[in-house]
């Protein structure tokens, strides 16, 4: 089974070694063809704690690391221009 990878935006980094990533999925409505956006939030493992809010990241599915954490950070695609 291939490993699933997704691109998302970091919306929280308040926890130790954990980030919350928002992933948007766009798809057309089957009848009306309007583009709909479905948003999901995933907890991802950030071992070094290098992500900030607003960063665009690549996450990969992995074995369960805790009750809700099943994704890990692969790399930061672009840094946020927000200053913390």
UniProtKB/Swiss-Prot annotation:
This protein's record includes keyword RNA-binding: yes
InterPro entries per record: NA-bd_OB-fold, Ribosomal_uS17, Ribosomal_uS17_bact/chlr, Ribosomal_uS17_CS
Keywords: Chloroplast, Plastid, Ribonucleoprotein, Ribosomal protein, RNA-binding, rRNA-binding
MF term (GO), any: structural constituent of ribosome
Primary location group: plastid
Cellular compartments annotated: Plastid, Chloroplast
GO CC list: chloroplast; mitochondrion; ribonucleoprotein complex; ribosome
Domain of life: Eukaryota
Single Gene Ontology BP annotation: translation
SUPFAM superfamilies, per the entry: Nucleic acid-binding proteins (SSF50249)
Pfam family, one: Ribosomal_S17
CDD domains: Ribosomal_uS17
Quaternary structure annotation from Swiss-Prot or TrEMBL: Part of the 30S ribosomal subunit.
PANTHER family in the record: 40S RIBOSOMAL PROTEIN S11 FAMILY MEMBER, SMALL RIBOSOMAL SUBUNIT PROTEIN US17M
Function description: One of the primary rRNA binding proteins, it binds specifically to the 5'-end of 16S ribosomal RNA.
Membership in a protein family: Belongs to the universal ribosomal protein uS17 family.
Entry protein name: Small ribosomal subunit protein uS17c
Gene it is expressed from: rps17
């Amino acid at each position: 089974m291939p490993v699933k990878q997704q691109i998302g935006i970091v919306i929280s980094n308040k926890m130790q070694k954990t980030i919350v990533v928002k992933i948007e999925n766009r798809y057309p409505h089957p009848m009306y063809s309007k583009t709909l956006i479905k948003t999901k939030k995933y907890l991802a493992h950030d071992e070094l704690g290098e992500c900030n809010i607003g960063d665009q990241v690549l996450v990969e599915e992995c074995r369960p690391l805790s009750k809700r954490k099943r994704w890990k950070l692969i790399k930061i695609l672009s840094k946020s221009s927000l200053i913390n």
